[in-house]
A protein has these predicted regions:
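Conserved catalytic alpha/beta core of Sir2/sirtuin-type deacylases, generalized to analogous enzyme cores
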Residues: 1-4, 10-30, 38-41, 150-272, ...
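Electropositive, gly/pro-rich neighborhoods at or near active sites that engage anionic ligands
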Residues: 33-238
Length: 400
């Protein structure tokens, strides 16, 4: 069986771990857009002149499929630098590690201690990363709060001329991912995500789209070629709402979906819209040109995994999420597709004990979307409230 899954970073972790645990032989094609731009991921994008996708969601997806102990090592972060002296101390620590073979305390004192061979591998990739950044930008990287895994992936990109596809495959090999699991770029062109709230507030980057701590809903997101400059942010923020929308409309970019994604959607036996942060993870991947045409022409089940818990006060409800899946898919095509050909099933949880549970009305769903088969069960993970029970979701999907 061939399965295509639209995914972000963390939202489908338990499902992916269930696939790995069961050692399923199905061909899995995981579609990730890489619009993330927060923290060290955003810094790496900047250091590479925004010629690459955000790497964080790709790494989270890949490592979810791996049982290799090195995964825990790659989760280790460099200490946060809160002032100038701590930055100087960090530079000294890195020098001692690279030149004097003195292992930093944050590595030796970590819960998961790297082996000698792992330390050597980390050192090689760290040197490649910071040396190349200095060579081409004359900038010493501030590694505050950087993940080891991010540095390794950035080094792979440098060694492979920023070829994302090749770097993904090599990182998968490092993580010992099964050969039947393919991680695909949703689009080849690296883009940047911005948005606007219904009250007119600008969301100037992907991080603000994800972390919009407000009860006001997101009205629209836009994918643009270059990140907004400070001058652009100031200018847009000073405009009235309609003028803001007009400005962002002019910046918006449309691009083709990755041909590998289109081929996968065309031949899939199951297409899954995974759970996660909708406006940054799943939905943007649906608006790349060609996606809806391939999904609509395939008669396989198309399954939406509804989120269990609100991440923010303005998080989408289940009914709104279905509407947005259809709306974003519509943007990817000049043809008018019947919604029945775009989504056929939805998985919703009937566990009412989840904190900040996303409320839905089964009868409302049946009235608004009568063609959708609703699969209702307790999909909550008993060990981690608010996350999916990966094995139960997997069983439900494979039994459709």
């Amino acid at each position: 069986m061939k399965i295509s899954i639209f995914s972000g970073g963390r939202g489908n972790k338990n499902l992916f771990q269930a696939f790995a645990k069961e050692q399923c032989e199905h061909e899995l094609n995981i579609i990730v857009n890489g619009l993330d731009d927060g923290a060290s991921t955003g810094d790496i994008r900047r250091l590479m002149d925004y010629k690459i996708h955000g790497i964080s969601d790709f790494l989270k997806t890949i490592t979810a499929f791996s049982n290799d102990p090195f995964i825990d090592v790659m989760e280790i972060r460099f200490p946060k630098n809160s002032n100038f002296l701590e930055k100087i101390k960090m530079i000294s620590t890195i020098y001692q590690f690279l030149e004097q073979n003195i292992t930093p305390e944050f590595l030796t004192n970590s819960k998961t201690k790297p082996t000698e061979s792992q330390l050597k591998f980390i050192k090689e990739n760290l040197l490649t990363f910071i040396e190349n950044v200095y060579k081409f930008r004359e900038e010493i990287v501030d590694l505050s709060d950087y993940k080891i895994g991010n540095i390794i992936f950035a080094s792979l990109l440098i060694n492979n001329n920023l070829d994302f596809k090749v770097s993904i495959k090599k990182f998968c090999k490092i993580c010992n991912i099964q050969s039947n699991v393919n991680i695909l770029e949703a689009a080849k062109l690296p883009l940047n995500l911005v948005g606007i709230l219904k009250n007119g507030t600008l969301l100037p980057n992907e991080a603000s789209v994800v972390l919009s701590r407000t009860t006001d809903l997101i009205q629209r997101t836009y994918q643009i070629n270059n990140p907004l400059s400070l001058n652009q942010i100031r200018k847009i923020s000073s405009l009235e709402k309609n003028d803001k929308i007009q400005y962002l409309n002019a910046l918006e970019t449309t691009t083709d979906s990755n041909i590998e994604v289109l081929n996968s959607l065309e031949c899939s036996d199951l297409i899954i819209y995974g759970s996660g942060t909708p406006y940054s993870s799943t939905l943007p991947s649906l608006e790349y040109l060609g996606v809806a045409d391939k999904i609509a022409s395939n008669n396989c089940p198309k399954i939406l995994i509804a989120n269990l818990q609100k991440e923010t006060d303005n998080f989408l409800g289940t009914s709104s999420l279905i509407e947005d899946v259809i709306k974003f898919l519509t943007k990817s095509s000049t043809l008018k597709h019947d919604p029945k050909d775009l989504i056929t099933h939805i998985l919703v949880s009937n566990n009412n004990e989840i904190e900040n549970k996303i409320v839905f009305d089964i009868q409302e769903l049946k009235i608004k979307f009568p063609w959708i088969t609703i699969i209702e069960d307790d999909f909550n993970d008993p060990n981690i409230k608010g996350t999916h029970n990966g094995s139960k979701v997997l069983d439900s999907i494979l039994n459709i």
